[in-house]
Curated annotation (Swiss-Prot):
Gene coding for it: lysDH
Coiled coil: none
UniProtKB keywords: NAD, Oxidoreductase
Job description of the protein: Catalyzes the oxidative deamination of L-lysine in the presence of NAD. Can also use (S)-(2-aminoethyl)-L-cysteine as a substrate, but more slowly. Can use both NAD and NADP but the preferred substrate is NAD.
Superkingdom of the organism of origin: Bacteria
EC number: 1.4.1.18
Record field: catalytic activity: L-lysine + NAD(+) = L-1-piperideine-6-carboxylate + NH4(+) + NADH + 2 H(+)
One protein family per Pfam: Sacchrp_dh_C
Protein name as it appears in the record: Lysine 6-dehydrogenase
pH dependence: Optimum pH is 10.1.
Protein species of origin: Geobacillus stearothermophilus
């Protein structure tokens, strides 16, 4: 198969690294508006399969020209490009996967292209990161093994191995996105009813092998498409994992309106957004700076099988790759989108149209693919008679 990777940033680079190592991948084209950046990645990865091109993703004609001759597109661009990329892929007759974008309902707009994609014989899968992404695939896999699905509980965190004050956290993805997840309300299902709860609320203790006690709390966006894929759930909740005390400190910032987009103040005659100041202060403070990080993930799917109450639990503790200087979050995210792109290219995934991950990605095959890449996902089944 021939794969086009859009975006030579961290995720695009790591997806390309994974793709060129696959025997099934004949050629990889890495496209970016900054050609020098793409060419630098090509030099770093030392693969004859890999080539760089300049593409402005805001120009559908350039996008279409770049897509031609490829089997699958791995879209590792900022989420605002996702709808344009999906539409262009459908028009060009090329399969496409992306990292998602629930801010501004971008993923919803991609999902609305289902009939067009189906008619074109194209598969589009959005939301293929960790959360959403890995958690959706594992939720769908757990649900497929039950006769009735009653609850899905999700816990995910990307944290430093050795925390440092003031927040005991280092950012492993966009800080802007993090503030949005902490500020916007979280959608949950409780007692069969959809409702919103404040982010950073309902803090609970949580433990993982080698890590704990930690804390978990509600944040926005994590339940993604699961409430629609499983509308009859009695309970659906997503919580972010951090070191203890983090939620309380961040809640103060939110309560002071320092994280909101719509707040401005006047200082010495200048209009200033406190959020912009906060981001400028936090970015150098919270930079990972090459320190070790870890992704902790737990998915708990409950329901009934053969009349018995059954709980399926999936868990991973994944560390960074020191040799290649790749964060744990980048590994788990890039491996997920690359592995699923290859499942489409190999003909393992054959459904055509636009589907969220939980409805189309075979969980057992996905777990095997991640194991090959050093990301081990354990599975535990508990049956209550």
């Amino acid at each position: 198969m021939k794969v086009l990777v859009l975006g030579a940033g961290l995720m695009g680079k790591e997806a390309a690294r994974d793709l060129v190592q696959s025997q099934d991948v004949e050629a990889v084209t890495l496209a970016d508006v900054d050609l020098a950046k793409a060419e630098q990645t090509v030099r770093q990865l030392h693969s004859k399969k890999l080539a760089a091109v300049r593409v402005d993703a805001g120009d559908p004609q350039q996008l279409a020209a770049a897509m031609k001759g490829h089997d699958v597109v791995v879209n590792a661009l900022f989420y605002q490009f996702n709808e344009t990329v999906a539409k262009t892929a459908i028009e060009t007759g090329v399969h496409s996967v992306d990292l998602g974008g629930h801010i501004g309902h971008i993923t919803d707009r991609v999902l609305e292209l289902h009939e067009r994609a189906q008619a074109a014989g194209v598969t589009i899968i959005p939301d293929l990161g960790v959360a959403p992404g890995m958690i959706n695939i594992l939720s769908g896999y757990g649900a497929s093994q039950l006769d009735e699905v009653e609850s899905i509980l999700l816990y995910v965190g990307g944290i430093p191995v050795r925390p440092e004050p003031p927040l005991e956290y280092n950012h492993v993805f966009s800080l802007e996105g993090l503030l949005d997840h902490y500020t916007d309300p979280a959608l949950i299902i409780r007692n069969g009813q959809k409702q919103e709860v404040p982010s950073l609320s309902e803090v609970e203790p949580i433990y993982f092998d080698r890590f704990g006690p930690l804390e978990a709390f509600h944040t926005s966006g994590g339940t993604s498409t699961l409430s629609r894929s499983f509308p009859n759930l009695k309970r659906l909740e997503y919580k972010t994992i951090r070191y203890r005390g983090h939620a309380e400190k961040c809640k103060l910032l939110v309560d002071l309106t320092l994280t909101r987009h719509d707040v401005e103040v006047e200082i010495n005659g200048c209009r200033v957004k406190p959020r912009d100041v906060l981001l400028s202060v936090l970015k150098p403070l919270l930079d990972l700076k090459g320190k070790d990080d870890v992704v902790l993930l737990r998915v708990i799917v409950g329901g009934r099988k053969d009349g018995k109450e059954t709980v399926l639990e999936y868990e991973t503790v994944t560390f960074n790759d020191r040799e290649n200087k790749v964060t744990a979050m980048a590994r788990t995210t890039a491996y997920t989108i690359s592995a699923v792109a290859q499942l489409i290219g190999r003909g393992v995934i054959t459904k055509r149209g636009v589907y969220p991950p939980e409805q189309i990605v075979p969980g057992d095959v996905y777990m095997d693919e991640m194991k090959k890449r050093g990301v081990l996902i354990s599975e535990k089944r508990t049956v209550h008679s």
